[in-house]
Amino acid sequence: MSDTHELSLTRTIDAPPEKVWDVMVNRLEEWYCPAPWRAEIDRQERRAGGRCEMTFYGPVGEAMPQNGIYLAFDEGRRFVSTDAVVFGEDGDFEPAGPMMIGFWEIEPEGSGTRYTARARHWTEESRKQHVEMGFEAGWGACADQLKALCEA
């Protein structure tokens, strides 16, 4: 896939990778959605092919389901999900309106951790739409929230 359809950001976190990973996966609701919005996990199956379902709630009652599947869940290193596939009412995979494949990755860097979030899109139009939706501000706020939790 061409990297022209990818958006990414990186943060250096002054905490060991083990702590960052723990916060990433066990305190997801505290950092995964930019405040004042909040995320609630509806269902999370931490394995490739597992459900990744949550709802984002806005400050005036908005609700935005965020459903998909994990493509990879590499303990201590990364998780990858997509909204291109969801589970239907019969419990089987169904196609959905794809926007992206999301990557959330960590790796040791000095005495801390490098956190990288990437969004790969099927088309340039989809990538541009994500930029217009506020990728840098929104995903940047989430990364900063994660950083603050890990460094506290």
Predicted regions and their residues:
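Hydrophobic pocket/interface hotspot
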Residues: 20-24, 28, 52, 70, ...
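Basic/polar N-terminal segments that are highly enriched at the extreme N-terminus
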Residues: 1-4, 148-152
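Residues at helix-coil transition
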Residues: 14, 25-26, 75, 87, ...
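Hydrophobic-ligand binding "helix-grip"
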Residues: 32-33, 40-48, 53, 59-110
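Short beta-strand segments enriched in hydrophobic/aromatic residues
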Residues: 13, 24, 56-58, 85, ...
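Hydrophobic ligand-binding cavity/cleft-lining segments
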Residues: 1-39
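Beta-strand/loop substructures that line and gate deep hydrophobic ligand-binding cavities in soluble
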Residues: 6, 89-137
